A protein has these predicted regions:
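Second-shell loop/turn segments in exported
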Residues: 41-46, 65, 73, 89-99, ...
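N-terminal signal peptide c-region/cleavage motif recognized by signal peptidases
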Residues: 25-26
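N-terminal targeting signals for Sec/Tat export/insertion, comprising classic cleavable signal peptides
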Residues: 38-62
Length: 237
């Protein structure tokens, strides 16, 4: 559950319904064949689910219930703002300088005017693109590789896993904080992301006979569409 933020709540909902509609299609079979590590993945999926149910989801529910919505929005904006330079770099690597400039502009505007707590840049017409290294590698022609479920982080692939590990290593919050501060920052980030995903729980539980396959298919479809559709308008979260 924790890794869904990778492609946005609204987009995950669209991908989830597509996964349900295509559950018995040749595409679903092809995606199943892209999961040679399924026994291991299912074991990690079970671990993640247990951890989520015992710790992360209850904390996220309390967070959503007791923290005012404007403050939660500000926290989410702050997290997203820290990712803008990374998105700009990936746009450059993909040969999209205009989007890179937009990302840098978003970072500067939101940082200067709101310390990253607001998103006035969107009001100025600078839309968030949300690029990552996994998408860059896909644009460069690297295949997704086998589907992976990462401990705590959730659904991924070999290609996206490389991108996510690289992003963690070069996370800017690591450079400006101590080990304990970074751990606290990461915990807040996880809880905030999980709180945003709470509305998706009922959709998945009611629509999926096999939650593992449902989430895998939705993830793979969404990631592929992100790579194929990058010539269109910037991402809107």
């Amino acid at each position: 559950m924790i890794g869904f933020r990778l492609f946005g709540l609204r987009r995950f909902a669209i991908a989830a319904w597509a996964a349900l509609a295509l559950a018995v299609s040749p595409l679903a079979l092809a995606q199943s064949e892209a999961d040679p590590l399924e026994p291991l993945n299912r074991a990690i999926f079970g671990f993640n689910d247990a951890l989520d149910g015992a710790v992360i989801k209850p904390v996220a529910q309390a967070y959503a219930e007791h923290v005012p919505a404007p403050l939660r929005t500000a926290i989410g904006n702050f997290m997203n703002n820290l990712l803008e330079p990374w998105s700009a770099l990936n746009n450059l690597l993909q040969g999209k300088p205009e989007r890179a400039v937009s990302d840098v502009g978003r970072f500067l505007v939101n940082t200067v005017l709101t310390l990253g707590l607001g998103d006035v840049a969107t009001e100025f017409g600078l839309e968030r693109t949300g690029e990552d290294l996994g998408q860059t590698l896909g644009v460069w022609g690297f295949g997704a590789g086998p589907y992976l479920v990462l401990p705590v982080l959730g659904p991924s692939s070999l290609r996206d896993g490389v991108g996510r590990v690289t992003a963690i290593v070069y996370d800017p919050s690591r450079k400006i904080s101590s080990g304990s501060e970074f751990a606290a920052f990461t915990a807040v980030r996880i809880v905030d992301l999980r709180a945003e995903l709470l509305p998706m729980d009922k959709l998945i539980d009611s629509a999926a006979l096999d939650r593992y396959s449902f989430i895998r298919n939705a993830y793979l479809q969404r990631r592929q569409s992100l790579i194929e559709d990058r010539s269109s308008s910037p991402t809107k979260e």
